[in-house]
Structures are given as structure tokens and as C-alpha cells.
């Protein structure tokens, strides 16, 4: 007997229904805003992540040397891949480029609630515009996807920040600070003890007094006070940009979900401007449902022309936890609309009935094992078929089939020549 690998999951039909409903909701929201689907490889050259993603990702790579001697890795995230794709056809692609993709990723990390070594995300990216409306639009897609699943503003919140506010505040201190290290420390602020948090800020170059002052600034909600403290155009412009994004979110009807949270930093090194994370409002999920932000320099770092970009990536493990905690996890297990039951030598007639129902868009199961009448009825009940159509020799001799509603037990006969007839989804009451 072989055991499943730690951090990997099997999804049986009962689990796949809710997962598929959640994925479809996010993808449908993306498509409604004009995003187009792309497909991407499961593996890339390891050096791409070493060069572009930062230490946090590199330490968790599933990487190896392939049979051709190349150092390769299973993709731990999508942004570098789609950046590579944009660079490859940058001149031919119409701007702005709006793409989405749902697929698995892999990171070697310790499994816990909502975190697995193989995990699934729907990535949404916009390339080719720095307009704040693009930032607001990816938030709007995410919000529309969540609310279409039954969530409300009482269930989730978008915590929004700006990398240049953080970097500008750090630069205002009389210290030589490793800005990226300090921002990575801010990103894990809620995950480590305060003493360790201050130690890490000190290791990045701040004194302990400066670290305390910096943290106090992040806890405040007065953006004008931050501009005054820093006294630089960098922070002033970043605050103005953040406000413009929030104004655009208001226009799109999603400002109600957004809270300014300067301790939201995102740990990946390529983020440059506005960043955001979605959290469960109750705190029960315990980690971000998803995150994203602006990465205006990444295309150029891949060798392309300067191209501003922004993206977000809802994670489906944490999203399903959020839906479950809110009591709105979709109950969408796949079940047949019809089971066509055969009695006697009726293969041809049963196949014709099943084909006619399928042509009308129905999900139809049939017997492929030669089971008895009772065994077929038990199977139809077990797989949750709504309606059973019985195609038996005796009924056919009279020119009929029998239709049975599995929930109520009600049944009637219908002329086979008129079934399904004008009915796309024929029911017992249509022929009673």
C-alpha cells in the first residue's frame, strides 16, 4: 500500500465539487472584466527563481537536475513565468495585457491549516499600465469572485499598503538599512514574537529605538503624519498613489472591503508599489486568503521593455476555509441529472434515450456492467441521480419508457417517440 506524500492532497468527487465551484467563480469574475486565460508549464529553470523571486521562495523550491543536466524547479509561483511570457512576445501583445490562470504550485514548507506543499491558485495579472484603476480592478475581480460565492464584507477584508511608504519611512531614519530585509521582517510581523521582530529589524540596520518608532508609525492610520515624518517626495507620492487606488476602488464599488494596513508588506522582493492581502475578518483562517500587488520592475529585470504590472493570486485552500467558516461553502458535488436504467435487451433504445438527453445539455449516466434492476436503482440512488428513466422490454412493447423522480418516488410513463420531445430537462410532471 502506498501512502500519499505529506503536504499533498487527494480530491474525491465530494471535495472536487466545492473546489470547482470556487475556481469557476474567480475565473468567471476575471473573464467578466476582460481577462483571458493562459496556460503555463509546471517547471522552469531554477535560476529564474534564484534571480527574481528572493530567498523565501528559493529556500522552498522543489528543484533538481534533470536528465539533460539542467537545474530545474517545479513552479512555486506564477508571476515570474508570466513575466517571461510577456517578454517573449512583448511587441506583439496588445496592452494592457490581462491574463488569468488556475493551476497547482509547489513549495517545500511545513504543512498546516490552509498551507500545503502542493497548492492551487488562480493568478490574475495586468501588464502595461501604471494607472491606479488597474490596481483597483484586480481587487474588484477578487471581490466579485468572493461575493458571488456568498461572502459579504463581514467575512473578509482587503488590507492595502504601499512598498514605497515602507521604504521611504525606513530611508528617513539616520541608519544604513537593508530595506528588503526590513520589509520582509514587516511581512512576518504577525507570525513571530515581538522580541524576535525587533531583533530582525535591528539586524536590518535600525537601532532598537528606531525599530520601535518605525513600528509605531506602521500602527498609525494618519497618512499625512507619515508624509510629514519622512519629508520626502517618495513617501508623499506613495501616499498619493495609495489614495488614488482607494478612490478607484470606490468607483468600482469595492472600497468597502479595503482597509489601509501599513504592516501589510508582502515578502517577495519584486513588489514595488501598492500591495494587498485578503484576510478572514474573524481571524479563524489564521493566514492570508490571498495576496498581490504591483511589480513594475519585473519585466525589465527579465530583459524586456519597462512595463508596469499588477496582480493578485487567490489561493483555493484558504479560500475554501474562508467559505466553510462563513457557512457558504458550495454544495456542488457532481451528480447525474439522469440515470438511464436498462431492463432486458434494450441497449440500443437506452443509448438513444441517453444521447437525446445529453444533446440537451444534461448529465446522463447509464449501466455499463449488466447489473440487475435493483442493483441499477441502488447505484442511481448512491450517485445522486435526480431522475431515472427506465427503458424496459415490457414498456417498449407498449411504446413507452418509465420516468421516476428519485427524491419523491413519483413515477409515470411517457411515449418513447415523444421523449424527451420538447423538454430539455424532462420531469415526471411533464408526462403525468
From Swiss-Prot:
Reactions catalysed: tRNA(His) + L-histidine + ATP = L-histidyl-tRNA(His) + AMP + diphosphate + H(+)
Alphabetic keyword roster: Aminoacyl-tRNA synthetase, ATP-binding, Cytoplasm, Ligase, Nucleotide-binding, Protein biosynthesis
Pfam hit, one: tRNA-synt_His
GO molecular function: ATP binding; histidine-tRNA ligase activity
DNA damage recorded as keyword: no
Subcellular location field: Cytoplasm
GO (cellular component) term, any one: cytoplasm
Signal peptide: none
GO biological processes: histidyl-tRNA aminoacylation
EC number: 6.1.1.21
Subcellular location, principal: cytoplasm
PROSITE patterns: AA_TRNA_LIGASE_II (PS50862)
Homology family: Belongs to the class-II aminoacyl-tRNA synthetase family.
Entry-linked HAMAP family: His_tRNA_synth
Protein name (database record): Histidine--tRNA ligase
Organism: Halobacterium salinarum (strain ATCC 700922 / JCM 11081 / NRC-1)
Amino acid at each position: 500500500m502506498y501512502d500519499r506524500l505529506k503536504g499533498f492532497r487527494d480530491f474525491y468527487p465530494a471535495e472536487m465539487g466545492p473546489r470547482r465551484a470556487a475556481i469557476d467563480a474567480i475565473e468567471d469574475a476575471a473573464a467578466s472584466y476582460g481577462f483571458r486565460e493562459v496556460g503555463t508549464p509546471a517547471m522552469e529553470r531554477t535560476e529564474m527563481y534564484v534571480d527574481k523571486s528572493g530567498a523565501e521562495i528559493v529556500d522552498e523550491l522543489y528543484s533538481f537536475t534533470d536528465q539533460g543536466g539542467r537545474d530545474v524547479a517545479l513552479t512555486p509561483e506564477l508571476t515570474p513565468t508570466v513575466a517571461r511570457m510577456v517578454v517573449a512576445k512583448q511587441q506583439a501583445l496588445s496592452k494592457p495585457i490581462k491574463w488569468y490562470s488556475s493551476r497547482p504550485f509547489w513549495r517545500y514548507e511545513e504543512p498546516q491549516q490552509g498551507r500545503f506543499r502542493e497548492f492551487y491558485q488562480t493568478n490574475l495579472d495586468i501588464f502595461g499600465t501604471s494607472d491606479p484603476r488597474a490596481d483597483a480592478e484586480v481587487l474588484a475581480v477578487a471581490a466579485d469572485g468572493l461575493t458571488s460565492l456568498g461572502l459579504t464584507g463581514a467575512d473578509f477584508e482587503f488590507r492595502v499598503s504601499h512598498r514605497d511608504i515602507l521604504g521611504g519611512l525606513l530611508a528617513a531614519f539616520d541608519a544604513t538599512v537593508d530595506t528588503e530585509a526590513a520589509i520582509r521582517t514587516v511581512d512576518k510581523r504577525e507570525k513571530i514574537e515581538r522580541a524576535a521582530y525587533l531583533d530582525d529589524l535591528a539586524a536590518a540596520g535600525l537601532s532598537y529605538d528606531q525599530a520601535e518608532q518605525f513600528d509605531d508609525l506602521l500602527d498609525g492610520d494618519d497618512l499625512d503624519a507619515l508624509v510629514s515624518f519622512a519629508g520626502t517626495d517618495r513617501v508623499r507620492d506613495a501616499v498619493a498613489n495609495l489614495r488614488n487606488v482607494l478612490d478607484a476602488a470606490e468607483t468600482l464599488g469595492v472600497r468597502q472591503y479595503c482597509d489601509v494596513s501599513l504592516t501589510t508588506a508582502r515578502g517577495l522582493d519584486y513588489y514595488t508599489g501598492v500591495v494587498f492581502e485578503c484576510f478572514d475578518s474573524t481571524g479563524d483562517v489564521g493566514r492570508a486568503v490571498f495576496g498581490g500587488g504591483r511589480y513594475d520592475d519585473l519585466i525589465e529585470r527579465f530583459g524586456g521593455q519597462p512595463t508596469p504590472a499588477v496582480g493578485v493570486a487567490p489561493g483555493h485552500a484558504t479560500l475554501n476555509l474562508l467559505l466553510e467558516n462563513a457557512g457558504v461553502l458550495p454544495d456542488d458535488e457532481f451528480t447525474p441529472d439522469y440515470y438511464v436504467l436498462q431492463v432486458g435487451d434494450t441497449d440500443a433504445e437506452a443509448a438513444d434515450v441517453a444521447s437525446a438527453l445529453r444533446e440537451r445539455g444534461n448529465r446522463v449516466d447509464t449501466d455499463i456492467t449488466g447489473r440487475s434492476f435493483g442493483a441499477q436503482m441502488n447505484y442511481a440512488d448512491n450517485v445522486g441521480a435526480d431522475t431515472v428513466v427506465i427503458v424496459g422490454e415490457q414498456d417498449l412493447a407498449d411504446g413507452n419508457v418509465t420516468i421516476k423522480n428519485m427524491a419523491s418516488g413519483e413515477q409515470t410513463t411517457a411515449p418513447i417517440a415523444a421523449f424527451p420531445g420538447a423538454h430539455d430537462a424532462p420531469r415526471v410532471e411533464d408526462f403525468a
